[in-house]
């Protein structure tokens, strides 16, 4: 079993006084169901799990009056082998997007407050909009993502103490011994090639076979394409799939990583395809980095909604869009050109997305200054440049010189830790997991 950080978040929810129902959100196949089942196994006497895709007729439980006593009674008749007891039974409603009345019922479970209820499902951002009465104010949220690099290291047998020692070099800004740095870069390249989808990571942990990982990645991508075909409106199906499958080309095959509609279709325009991007966003299939015209706080004041970069929600899905040879080049460190810079930028944004940062990038056509990633942390703007090699970060240096309110910026590269007189902190690519 792969260790996941989400377990600690669910424990915090359980220990909350007067807790609400917990909605576990996130893209498909990120481990939501598995984590909830394992948590119930370790923390409850009984798990009552209803998967509305598998048990289609279970919607009848929610077809009458949505009082808790009525719903519990219906559950007891449907599942007589289960003991449904307050505080001792976890009620888990999976694939809840298939039963709108179950979504409505969350309000009444929360008001009653006798039973612990967790719900999950994919595409919730879309289907909640169709709920007859969404329980605003009666649910807590936990968003799950694919496995991050630290969780990957746990899966590879690297202990938390070892990671703590590694972070010590980050805190003191001292050079990491070459033997450790070299091995960490090897792990990081493996992680980029595998991505963070739990099934792909588990397959690698078990087999160390990238061909087997590749099969998993391609199967996952087909599942996402199926979801588009199944859940998107008739108007959006084809357009959304075209946009989604263009992402690798948008970010790895050209120098300018801006999402361009002409890469979706010859002559493509925002008027035709922007609604499809919005659909993919609500479906947890993509996330965006928006252009900012200035690097001052608050970044959202300077963001342009029409100028953005689009990313898959996990590296595993990006890998499935490309030939197997890309994984070979990543692991063997033989990438060159746009692909090298693009894949490392992708990995850095993937890590920050999983840390729940809002992502931006900066580009000034007049001065030719460009910053790959801009975020806000602790009320400050942080500039991040990503380098395939250990080259200079001229735009970063120039912007920090002209914006005295920006106290530091990062350059992530193949190299080791270093701090320049200009305030630029150079870090190995893998250190993005620990800032």
Where are these regions (language model features)?
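N-terminal pre-Walker A segment at the start of P-loop NTPase domains
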Residues: 1-13
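Conserved lysine of the Walker
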Residues: 32
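Short glycine-rich substrate-engagement loop in P-loop NTPases that contacts/grips substrate
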Residues: 56-87
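Interdomain motor-coupling "hinge/lid" segment immediately C-terminal to the ATP-binding subdomain
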Residues: 129-253
């Amino acid at each position: 079993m792969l260790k996941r950080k989400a377990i600690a978040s669910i424990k915090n929810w359980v220990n909350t006084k007067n807790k609400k129902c917990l909605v576990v959100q996130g893209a498909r196949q990120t481990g939501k169901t598995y984590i909830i089942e394992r948590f119930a196994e370790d923390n409850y006497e009984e798990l009552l799990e209803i998967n509305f895709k598998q048990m289609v007729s279970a919607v009848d439980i929610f077809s009458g009056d949505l009082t808790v006593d009525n719903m519990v009674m219906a559950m007891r008749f449907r599942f007589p082998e289960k003991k449904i007891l307050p505080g001792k039974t976890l009620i888990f409603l999976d694939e809840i997007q298939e039963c709108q009345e179950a979504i409505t019922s969350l309000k009444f479970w929360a008001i009653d407050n006798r039973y612990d209820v967790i719900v999950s499902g994919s595409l919730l951002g879309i289907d909640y909009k169709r709920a007859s009465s969404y329980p605003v104010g009666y649910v807590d949220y936990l968003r799950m993502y694919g496995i991050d690099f630290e969780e990957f290291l746990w899966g590879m047998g690297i202990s938390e103490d070892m990671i703590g020692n590694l972070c010590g070099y980050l805190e003191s800004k001292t050079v990491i011994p070459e033997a450790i740095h070299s091995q960490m870069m090897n792990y990081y390249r493996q992680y980029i090639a595998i991505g963070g989808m739990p099934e792909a990571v588990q397959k690698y942990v078990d087999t160390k076979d990238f061909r087997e990982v590749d099969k998993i990645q391609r199967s996952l991508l087909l599942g996402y394409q199926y979801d588009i075909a199944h859940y998107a409106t008739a108007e959006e199906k084809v357009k959304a799939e075209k946009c989604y499958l263009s992402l690798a080309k948008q970010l790895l095959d050209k120098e300018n990583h801006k999402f361009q509609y002409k890469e979706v279709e010859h002559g493509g325009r925002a008027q035709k395809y922007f609604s499809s991007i919005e659909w993919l966003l609500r479906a947890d299939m993509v996330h965006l980095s928006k252009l900012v015209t200035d690097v001052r706080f608050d970044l959202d004041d300077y963001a342009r909604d029409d100028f953005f970069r689009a990313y898959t929600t996990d590296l595993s899905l990006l890998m499935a869009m490309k030939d197997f040879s890309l994984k070979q080049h990543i692991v063997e460190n033989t990438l060159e050109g746009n692909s090298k810079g693009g894949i490392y930028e992708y990995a850095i944004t993937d890590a920050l997305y999983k840390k729940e940062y809002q992502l931006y990038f900066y580009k000034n056509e007049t001065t030719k200054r460009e910053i790959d990633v801009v975020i806000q942390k602790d009320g400050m703007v942080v500039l991040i440049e990503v380098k395939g090699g250990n080259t200079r970060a001229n735009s970063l240096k120039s912007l920090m010189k002209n914006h005295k309110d920006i106290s530091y910026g990062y350059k992530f590269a193949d190299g080791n830790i270093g701090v320049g007189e200009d305030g630029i902190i150079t870090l190995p690519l893998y250190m993005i997991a620990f800032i």
